[in-house]
Swiss-Prot record:
It is found in: Cytoplasm. It comes from Staphylococcus aureus (strain NCTC 8325 / PS 47). This is DNA polymerase III PolC-type. GO terms for molecular function: 3'-5' exonuclease activity; DNA binding; DNA-directed DNA polymerase activity. One of its GO terms (biological process) is DNA-templated DNA replication.
Amino acid sequence: MTEQQKFKVLADQIKISNQLDAEILNSGELTRIDVSNKNRTWEFHITLPQFLAHEDYLLFINAIEQEFKDIANVTCRFTVTNGTNQDEHAIKYFGHCIDQTALSPKVKGQLKQKKLIMSGKVLKVMVSNDIERNHFDKACNGSLIKAFRNCGFDIDKIIFETNDNDQEQNLASLEAHIQEEDEQSARLATEKLEKMKAEKAKQQDNNESAVDKCQIGKPIQIENIKPIESIIEEEFKVAIEGVIFDINLKELKSGRHIVEIKVTDYTDSLVLKMFTRKNKDDLEHFKALSVGKWVRAQGRIEEDTFIRDLVMMMSDIEEIKKATKKDKAEEKRVEFHLHTAMSQMDGIPNIGAYVKQAADWGHPAIAVTDHNVVQAFPDAHAAAEKHGIKMIYGMEGMLVDDGVPIAYKPQDVVLKDATYVVFDVETTGLSNQYDKIIELAAVKVHNGEIIDKFERFSNPHERLSETIINLTHITDDMLVDAPEIEEVLTEFKEWVGDAIFVAHNASFDMGFIDTGYERLGFGPSTNGVIDTLELSRTINTEYGKHGLNFLAKKYGVELTQHHRAIYDTEATAYIFIKMVQQMKELGVLNHNEINKKLSNEDAYKRARPSHVTLIVQNQQGLKNLFKIVSASLVKYFYRTPRIPRSLLDEYREGLLVGTACDEGELFTAVMQKDQSQVEKIAKYYDFIEIQPPALYQDLIDRELIRDTETLHEIYQRLIHAGDTAGIPVIATGNAHYLFEHDGIARKILIASQPGNPLNRSTLPEAHFRTTDEMLNEFHFLGEEKAHEIVVKNTNELADRIERVVPIKDELYTPRMEGANEEIRELSYANARKLYGEDLPQIVIDRLEKELKSIIGNGFAVIYLISQRLVKKSLDDGYLVGSRGSVGSSFVATMTEITEVNPLPPHYICPNCKTSEFFNDGSVGSGFDLPDKTCETCGAPLIKEGQDIPFETFLGFKGDKVPDIDLNFSGEYQPNAHNYTKVLFGEDKVFRAGTIGTVAEKTAFGYVKGYLNDQGIHKRGAEIDRLVKGCTGVKRTTGQHPGGIIVVPDYMDIYDFTPIQYPADDQNSAWMTTHFDFHSIHDNVLKLDILGHDDPTMIRMLQDLSGIDPKTIPVDDKEVMQIFSTPESLGVTEDEILCKTGTFGVPEFGTGFVRQMLEDTKPTTFSELVQISGLSHGTDVWLGNAQELIKTGICDLSSVIGCRDDIMVYLMYAGLEPSMAFKIMESVRKGKGLTEEMIETMKENEVPDWYLDSCLKIKYMFPKAHAAAYVLMAVRIAYFKVHHPLYYYASYFTIRASDFDLITMIKDKTSIRNTVKDMYSRYMDLGKKEKDVLTVLEIMNEMAHRGYRMQPISLEKSQAFEFIIEGDTLIPPFISVPGLGENVAKRIVEARDDGPFLSKEDLNKKAGLSQKIIEYLDELGSLPNLPDKAQLSIFDM
């Protein structure tokens, strides 16, 4: 294709062929296109036979930019072969060429008014005076020439000349003519472009290219669909359908796009790929796809060599409607038992998914009952409000009796004189109601000896299960001729007499004895009982286990054949004999004293927990539930949170208590007790739950329930108990996930917990069931009864529950008497101290503006709390750095909460208080003002002010809740935290709680582990799906690193949230909020008392030097120099392998920021603040400010760096403050600009590059935060420049963690070579090696400045701090790799007791490992220290 043909194709593509002159169309050439994929730019080089008319030129440029806007930023460079009338065209193009420069809109407007003369290749621009001439010549000469040349003009020079009267007169008519033609050209171009847009829009409507539904290729026949799991090899043509769970649309270098989607049909998953086709609207169809949509796809199955898996290369794809699960019942049920992702490592979906599904099915209400926690409540409330459904709040807890008796049926019998029958039963199962005794064995004990034995089998008249045979080693053959149980029990009762029964886990064995006695008409046994299991738990509290096997070993008793009754009995007897002696030593002498004298506060730990459902009935019930949850997590936590029955009874008001699942007390009673006892227990509850038979299938599989018939009988007994007690029986689903196919995720999570008892059995189907599904589950009860328990009773129970709101809807701040007055007085007092009694009006106006908002909105107390915390830290000798936007508040400055002064840059005289403010935006920071002396008294002036609007802190109306974040020294942080307890009281302050969920990487490990254990192979796409299913489930709890929640004195914590220990660590110093702190962020005050290295380092530098950091000059020239060159450190770039001197300087030491420094070479404080803002923002530097600076459009000081810059810049540009604030807020949140904002900015001549920059930004850093960080950084840098050893000692002590001492003690050349080698291998370095490299970079710099590192010194090294000796540093013991804090302390303590005599002595006294001793030896730290001490004759 010729270059002329290429030009025609281009003209056709951008649809302007009909608009161009025929000669130009036929003779124009597209000579080349320069493409930069990195910068997304295309530059078209076009040769034309003559100049385009100005309006055609504008049309061409607009059309080509529009056509390729989604692909790249397009520019054009024209060459005109016949430059006839160049001077005439230049005049017409003048305005357009000016627009291509980086001048401000205002200056561009001025320049366009100038007259010009074209003479050959020289363009003269007539200006008014020499000032204009110099300004224009410097500002735009080069860029204006470039703009003309890009348009095809052959121009060598542009000259700016001053006008004289003759020139003005001669050119007046020409100026008017040019202006008229410019306006006409612009109008014609605009009309043509609008016409083209309308035609294009019409064409799009006709072609339906803006698609809502994806449809590419041919329709796919449904009969060709095959399950994804059947795809196991490459195939030519396959059709599948599935739901999208991941999608990725990428643009290729060629300009085409590829869509990669992952779909599943729940048999397996597959990756599908497709490229956009030429001249098709595939991209629009790809964009119509999204996660959750069902598609039908057809294509070729092939092996993808990159992911090493089968993928489908699609030829056809269509979006389809998939039938969703419906609840078809006319009357809907209410679910009262379900678990969300907050049920730790057990539930799968978040509560929002359940609520949405229930609403879609038309359910009137839904409950949430997570295991032991209520952390889903805030999200449940939000979801219920969103979907218009009633939310029922509840929890499934662990109920325990307050004290589990050791002795039953107390007898007045002296223990040493008593006769005991130690016995054991073997049975066909665990239920004394449904299973039978097959062996009864006992020994009689008196005076510490076994005096008789009893051993009998009994015939159950049924075959034993394999489980029982394996457990007891009793076979059916052994029981064939055995007597009936009636005979055995009668004989046994007579043999026992009035002896005291003893058994291990006596409640089980006595349950079978009492049930047997009652069936024989004897009534329950009246003999005393002692349970050796509970006895051991009480008197052997140091044991972690109390099983018979374990106790036999501990007591030295032989147990030859566990789970055979006679052997278990004899072992228990010998253990019990020794226990009687233990009880005697504890003062327990009589059977009736055992429970009383051996009871303790920890009795709840011995009780076996039963599940219980607690439903909140009203607002009082919510608070009571919060109290119960808190007590169970804080006071009664033992392996799991426990709820003593007395605690539940105390706080039962407003709660409905349900029987929960098969682990509930009532279900267990049905298995172990007769009906009268079951009904007695049932009366404790407000409702009885029965769950689908499918959920109990594992009990049948594990032979805990005999069969389905027995299970149905259990249901009937539960229903009868409810009817008798007048308690509603409801069917609950015990849901752990939404749909059947989600169950695999729960299996994976359970399998990841080796100790979880659920691993012992097959997990039942626990999906969220529809009404018709539940009715079908209980069809065996009959239609009427099934409807009653599934629909009628659940709805009636839901109607008894009031609307409950778990989260407050307003902020409750603490009260401090006189806070308003104190903040006002403190602000003015410090302002007068700084600015004088006669305050400048700008100071008064700012204070009054802020105080009106702060006091008017009740925020004074927040300021006062922060002031007290900062003052305490300052009084204790630690500086505090502010974070966030608090430095935007002048009141915060005057109350000494922050050092950042947000007023415009200004001078202040420390003596006569004269001040001078710069309000025009000409100075970025007061610290950048030149040094100056007071004209009145001659004193050096103080320089202050960072020019930050107050609105960035409390919002434009000043009513946004202040978020005051403070950086305390890391070592002082615990003191600051504890000081809040002094201010408010221990029961009013809590750490802000967090919830840790399963991360994607962790979930991947779980999935891989599960598949490996099961011997299952799955392709990568299916693994990705399973990972997504497991991600986000609660794994643990934690605490915010510095967040303290303050409860006002007129409320208590339970008005907002329950409390707990982080990660259930009962030894934690602080309790946390049970809710994630974000949930209550708007209801209670959160103080961010964070720990930071900078204040700690400043404190150490102050201690070493005696220099008050507040006296350090911020504009020290040598300090400023290190941000662009290392010269002031006395080293070269080559020596330290870096072009700046900022290694180890906070905010400026990372490779990323050092590169920014190299690119920008900042010289002022305000520019350093810009760097800090640019480095912390998202899409603020890369692809944005960086390109603007590189291309010369603007410099570092004028790019957008911090969020506040936007508001200040726009106000200086003439925008109303309210609009400037709106724009700043929109941009900083990544929301871009609205049409109204863009229009307003253009009206005020804001340049296009500024608008473009705003549109790219995703997140911005507050200027106050950046200023506070830079202030700390500059102070630390001051020590680096002027007091090097103090700096290096502090840096290595405070900030460094990984050391290579072997390298660090070498000469500077060796250290440099090591650093250089690590740079060459950087991409292969692990995290630890990269941390070591950071330390070696600093060490290399230190060495080239003439200082060195000594080896560890046994005599001089400290535990944790680097110390200075001459021009060297001595490292501490903690710097030795692998040596921990305790060992470091121990070495110093041992050294204080006397010198180490040998390496063996060092090992014994300090506990050093051989590996560390060898390291110290290699380091040269153990000179002349022998391996073993030599005994001298003089020591004898």
